[in-house]
């Protein structure tokens, strides 16, 4: 049995009309992950619905409602092999009302491909594109490549490609802390497959890698196995004859049968009996594994989604308050002391109150612009002190980055995103 290729999780981000789903569909098809017969069937279906050209995107848009609307809603996971990796695609939704999915989706990615429409050079960078790139950066994705798509609509013009590339570098990438010189840009036409898996003869002026080769050039993630165990709970099931089975993804550390564990902020203590993934028992599970596990001594009513599992010797931190660096993405008015929106951190959703606005920063450089500002508005970056209204596990990004990041939502939109830089633990 040949050793399995390492898995690389790649998020596809960008504006809804940039052709992300088509790009992903093309990678899956040319990568041999889709039966070509399926594409023929979907093509017919797309033509009947008056959406010819959407057939690749149909592959990702599994849900019927999504097919009708032509919008990707839930985060879809699909796999295809490249020369080096088994790539799992995290296709992140583009529409603003699905940004929450984007936040939970992007945090599972090792690298991101930003898909942009070459035509945006004329209309300017879409706000959604900015938000996705910024969120990816905040969520800790340090590897990024850019696919400049729909090159067929500008006759594969090198000038248009260069204009878009420069605009992205100057007006977006530098601002959020990516160095454009270290980022690979690829001119693609996903609908026809140009430079996706196969080199295109229509871009003789481009001698860089294809999109599949760019993915192969990403570095594999280092699993944070040496950090303390942290496993945010997604769901809790009660299975007859087995008992309580919490489900979640190991973020850091290692979990195995026999471990003495604690759920915080619930405070429930138990012992791991079994660990399972895809209905198979495991001797242990490590970061990235989505598992179900059986715990002795803990009932279904004792724990819930948003609790975090750790070892009793190093329990998760329940925050009395925390200091965070945030960036305000959008807000109809201003944020002031006393503002209490909902924080989405790991699997928890808890309202937190702004206790202090300590510093306003330059979002591009991090330098302090103002001490103790009176308010924050869209586009501002800041250091703030926050207090959860209910018990919440939060870790400092310096210690356990996977549990230090969050998004702030209000009025049905993501108003800000950030990370905890210092956490004051609650006294028991």
Swiss-Prot record:
Residues 70-74 are annotated as: G2. GTP binds at residues 14-21, 91-95, 149-152. Its EC number is 3.6.5.3. Mg(2+) binds at residue 21. Residues 91-94 are annotated as: G3. Residues 149-152 are annotated as: G4. Keywords: Cytoplasm, Elongation factor, GTP-binding, Hydrolase, Magnesium, Metal-binding, Nucleotide-binding, Protein biosynthesis. Pfam families: GTP-eEF1A_C, GTP_EFTU, GTP_EFTU_D2, GTP_EFTU_D4. It is found in: Cytoplasm. One of its GO terms (cellular component) is cytoplasm. InterPro entries: EFTu-like_2, EFTU-type, G_TR_CS, GTP-eEF1A_C, P-loop_NTPase, Small_GTP-bd, T_Tr_GTP-bd_dom, TRAFAC_GTPase_members. It catalyses: GTP + H2O = GDP + phosphate + H(+). GO terms for molecular function: GTP binding; GTPase activity; translation elongation factor activity. It comes from the Archaea. Residues 14-21 are annotated as: G1. Residues 189-191 are annotated as: G5. Residues 5-225 form the tr-type G domain. The keyword Cell wall biogenesis/degradation does not apply. Belongs to the TRAFAC class translation factor GTPase superfamily. Classic translation factor GTPase family. EF-Tu/EF-1A subfamily. GTP hydrolase that promotes the GTP-dependent binding of aminoacyl-tRNA to the A-site of ribosomes during protein biosynthesis. This is Elongation factor 1-alpha. It comes from Methanococcus maripaludis (strain C5 / ATCC BAA-1333). The lineage of its organism: Archaea, Methanobacteriati, Methanobacteriota, Methanomada group, Methanococci.
